[in-house]
Amino acid sequence: MNDDRETPPKRKPGEDDTLFDIDFLDDTTSHSGSRSKVTNSHANANYIPPSHVLPEETIDLDADDDNIENDVHENLFMSNNHDDQTSWNANRFDSDAYQPQSLRAVKPPGLFARFGNGLKNAFTFKRKKGPESFEMNHYNAVTNNELDDNYLDSRNKFNIKILFNRYILRKNVGDAEGNGEPRVIHINDSLANSSFGYSDNHISTTKYNFATFLPKFLFQEFSKYANLFFLCTSAIQQVPHVSPTNRYTTIGTLLVVLIVSAMKECIEDIKRANSDKELNNSTAEIFSEAHDDFVEKRWIDIRVGDIIRVKSEEPIPADTIILSSSEPEGLCYIETANLDGETNLKIKQSRVETAKFIDVKTLKNMNGKVVSEQPNSSLYTYEGTMTLNDRQIPLSPDQMILRGATLRNTAWIFGLVIFTGHETKLLRNATATPIKRTAVEKIINRQIIALFTVLIVLILISSIGNVIMSTADAKHLSYLYLEGTNKAGLFFKDFLTFWILFSNLVPISLFVTVELIKYYQAFMIGSDLDLYYEKTDTPTVVRTSSLVEELGQIEYIFSDKTGTLTRNIMEFKSCSIAGHCYIDKIPEDKTATVEDGIEVGYRKFDDLKKKLNDPSDEDSPIINDFLTLLATCHTVIPEFQSDGSIKYQAASPDEGALVQGGADLGYKFIIRKPNSVTVLLEETGEEKEYQLLNICEFNSTRKRMSAIFRFPDGSIKLFCKGADTVILERLDDEANQYVEATMRHLEDYASEGLRTLCLAMRDISEGEYEEWNSIYNEAATTLDNRAEKLDEAANLIEKNLILIGATAIEDKLQDGVPETIHTLQEAGIKIWVLTGDRQETAINIGMSCRLLSEDMNLLIINEETRDDTERNLLEKINALNEHQLSTHDMNTLALVIDGKSLGFALEPELEDYLLTVAKLCKAVICCRVSPLQKALVVKMVKRKSSSLLLAIGDGANDVSMIQAAHVGVGISGMEGMQAARSADIAVGQFKFLKKLLLVHGSWSYQRISVAILYSFYKNTALYMTQFWYVFANAFSGQSIMESWTMSFYNLFFTVWPPFVIGVFDQFVSSRLLERYPQLYKLGQKGQFFSVYIFWGWIINGFFHSAIVFIGTILIYRYGFALNMHGELADHWSWGVTVYTTSVIIVLGKAALVTNQWTKFTLIAIPGSLLFWLIFFPIYASIFPHANISREYYGVVKHTYGSGVFWLTLIVLPIFALVRDFLWKYYKRMYEPETYHVIQEMQKYNISDSRPHVQQFQNAIRKVRQVQRMKKQRGFAFSQAEEGGQEKIVRMYDTTQKRGKYGELQDASANPFNDNNGLGSNDFESAEPFIENPFADGNQNSNRFSSSRDDISFDI
């Protein structure tokens, strides 16, 4: 298989298939016999041991069998015996030298390992007598089925390490990456397996648990500098005689903030936990020894060593070794799109020795064990050994089916669970749910530091001023006892006092307000019916609400293909036969016409059928050959359903679509036998059987597949299908008259993103075939370079072909994908598609979904070595630099890079080159990439640029990519929920990204930006008056306002305007945001939030605070503030005036920045002022008498009873806000932003003439595309490349009867049964041979014989 990803190591010639030559671990095996020794070179004379192996060491197998076995068990499972310098480890899996037969020595453990083992032993009970531990003895008891029921409880109760690993870390006690001792799994012995403490099948995607919530939550909250700042302030307030305010005001407010944040985090994590619970409670069928049958259990209850039954279309619940299946020789088909993104089905096959276990009775009698590698993250390797009846059977990736795969085209399989839960390879490739911080939050943290610097400056000015004033006026202020005061101590005390006094410049309610805003924004996103997918009853779910504003600033989208952009459903769309193009439904503008002697457009499939059935039509023989090729030249297996229909089992979805297309056109493939295929001609009811002589299989080098048939009339024909490039060069130069028309049709297909194949044939004489067949057979039996020699043999016969036509298959897209991608690109978002599929497939999808277009130049990087990749990248960079590309030119570039080249390009020395080329392209497609490479690509762009990234996928193979991006979006698909559970946002369809980003993203970013800026502004506007006041009170640290009133400012009186703006404000309507995607660039450019904008708001707050302080102090200092009784206002009355005026100004500012007034806006802005005006007299009347706030005693009559107070509340706010109003007027009238213009259009419902211009430009572009020379012809074909397809299809005889669930039912139909002499006439009377695995029943003992000549065995 031409694949850049990790593949399992191949065995060297001459290596034995067994994992051990001597079975140390089989408790049923006797070691008695002649005295023998095993050295570490016993298995293979060519084996070169690693440096740490001691070649001289041997084990005497006959000295003391029991002691030897105990020693091996001790080293293998417990690693406690380190008295000797070397501990033997049976079957240690070494990644450097794949020699599973060897017995290896490992280095003695280091200090830390010994310490860890000491702890383990300390918490494990020991026997009073003998060297063996309590645990070891119970292991021996387990192997002899003598374990009492209380053992597991006692073991887990006292082994702290196992308890911690199992219930806290949810992992196995073995090595984290599979480098430790191999695990032993006993078949049909759950008690023995339970003793090892293997992980259960529980999975969790939550951020917290009971043990980690508090530390993780506090770490997350106090990583926000504002919360850390107020924690310090709260501590300072507790120092006696320092705080000018109440000591509990800050800590009380901080606790409220933390409690609200904690509640929000808990609610979101509970949602994740519920989602996990839904998956964990999925059901599977587990073989029960107690019931002698399969019983339904939850996934979470599946344990290592369980035998499970999986039916067709069901997901695999855990990493499983296939034991048997309903198909011949234990074959099964699995879909791994959820794991690696590949669309073609994979073929897995059980070992022949286990394929006989096909019913409950045989499973019950299955005894043995598996020695398996430890859990690890490698998706493409596996090593293990199964021991059955003293025979050791090697296990490889061919028998391993991973969790996350789905069983297809196979009625059922039986499997042995090897890894569960977080030990499965799928979960090993997943990372812990990361804690992500938004770009806005990072800016806030930096600006808080800057604001803190300003705060320090203000504190220093005030503290130094107080020291100077105290020193200079000490003699005049003798009553203050300032003489002899320690200046350093005074400075330090003043520093702390002013810290507390000015600390509210940083809004303490900022983050809780923002968190609540984001929570409700997330709720509104989830409530949007436009983002609800009715077909699967799936709403959009925001799992991490703290990231919603990131949706408005995305510059790159990294998307999976299969299941995200496409449905993974292939449909036969059109075909070209004899120069004519046929399609089922013809678009109005595509009807076939003749222009300049050339037929343009499509004909209907009905016309094709008419021509086929008209013997006088010259195209009839060609159409017959074309449809016969579709029905015969493939590796598909037909399967009759209960309703009489046929379901085609196809490893390649393309082949399935082609065969189905042929059936729809009247040539129905109905029977496959080992040496023939049968086709039903529906028009006449005639069945034609074609003898299958040879199959020349598809691979990525050949790009074609051929089959040779003997027709019913005795003639021999070769059918060939493949890429246009390879078919054209093999055509007969004289007998091909349809080439030009066919190529023209291929170009039309490619422009529509359809997957194309060329079809050709030739007649072969008997003599030529016999001569070639001898060459082919010789190549098929050679041991060296067999694949290359088979390809050479195929080349000899695949010549002088006659082109008969071409096919077009549509890889059906998800709804709305092309329109969504086009709109997102108009919004300035670059889209990268990362897929495990082949290059041709990826390019075709790029064309069909409008990621690529005909006028784009493809920059293809498909190299085999690092040096070639570097050279290719540098050549492209130099070429692009020479042309001095404009923006328009860059919009015509697309990069296509394959997985192998990408692996080289991701190296530190080359990644800058890759990113340079990629940034110049409008679109990037990475094909044949592994899940790890997907994540590495995202991390590279994330690390090398300041852009915000979004990753979207639907499969488990996309989880790492999703978690690596700033925002991860998972599609709640039909095949699994792993991506959706691990994502920040779960959606039902890719098309929902359009509104999610353009509307909700833009709204969220603008709302959050204004809410944050406003929060800082309002605190600056009020609390800076405290700083101005120090110049009037001799730097004494006296506060203008009462303590609790200051705290209530953020909690009650100004909290609602930013909240309402953050939740309900709309700067542009959703309709216009979707209509003009260019508005999205406002977020990408940081138009609403930046350092410059932030300090503009802060300075505005300084300005407003100065106006309030100066205005009020002039009024009160000069005695203008008289109440109705002619009494002058006091200090606290002046403070209330300052406070109330500031509240009115900041509420007025909120009114100016509000874009859309709603009922909530009216409640929030005027309502907040009204709330304060009502609250103050109640508070000032009650609390002083309760001895809580005596400052406000009698203040109400000095304020509410003064006309100057009310006049001040009118004049000063107008004076302060007039500048803001004039600035807003100037910007809109003379320097309008883009969204200002759109707002005017929205307000006055002004129509836009630009659509007509755009339509004209699109028309011009289409004309130019037609006039251009087209090169893309759309070849794509998905097919597994492991080889062996011919062998597989020759195993099948679909005339054999099958039961309800697809199992073989007749002795003559069993591929393992000896020939019992039943002829075709006896077939119906044959007695049932294989028991229905879904029902109990008796079965006679029978002898099986594999279709492999060299293997036979008994039940």
From Swiss-Prot:
Pfam families referenced in this protein's UniProt entry, alphabetically: Cation_ATPase, PhoLip_ATPase_C, PhoLip_ATPase_N
InterPro entries found in the cross-reference section: ATPase_P-typ_cyto_dom_N (IPR023299), ATPase_P-typ_P_site (IPR018303), ATPase_P-typ_TM_dom_sf (IPR023298), ATPase_P-typ_transduc_dom_A_sf (IPR008250), HAD-like_sf (IPR036412), HAD_sf (IPR023214), P-type_ATPase_IV (IPR006539), P-type_ATPase_N (IPR032631)
Enzyme Commission number(s): 7.6.2.1
Family matches, as SUPFAM superfamilies: Calcium ATPase, transduction domain A (SSF81653), Calcium ATPase, transmembrane domain M (SSF81665), HAD-like (SSF56784), Metal cation-transporting ATPase, ATP-binding domain N (SSF81660)
TM stretches of this protein: 222-242, 247-267, 450-470, 491-511, 1013-1033, 1044-1064, 1095-1115, 1132-1152, 1162-1182, 1203-1223
Enzyme kind, highest EC tier: translocase
Biased segments, Basic and acidic residues type: 1-15, 1346-1355
Activity-regulation annotation: Allosterically activated by binding 1,2-diacyl-sn-glycero-3-phospho-(1D-myo-inositol 4-phosphate) (phosphatidylinositol 4-phosphate). Inhibited by orthovanadate, N-ethylmaleimide, trifluoroberyllate and tetrafluoroaluminate; orthovanadate and N-ethylmaleimide inhibit phosphorylation of the active site aspartic acid. The ATPase activity is not potently stimulated by phosphatidylinositol 3-phosphate and phosphatidylinositol 5-phosphate, phosphatidylinositol 4,5-bisphosphate or phosphatidylcholine. Not inhibited by azide.
Annotated residues for binding of a 1,2-diacyl-sn-glycero-3-phospho-(1D-myo-inositol 4-phosphate): 1149, 1219, 1223-1224, 1235-1236
Phenotypic consequence of residue 1235 to A: Abolishes ATPase activity and leads to cold sensitivity
Similarity remark: Belongs to the cation transport ATPase (P-type) (TC 3.A.3) family. Type IV subfamily.
Domain notes: The C-terminal part (1231-1309) serves an autoinhibitory function and is dislodged upon substrate binding.
Name listed for the protein in its UniProt record: Phospholipid-transporting ATPase DRS2
UniProt lineage: Eukaryota, Fungi, Dikarya, Ascomycota, Saccharomycotina
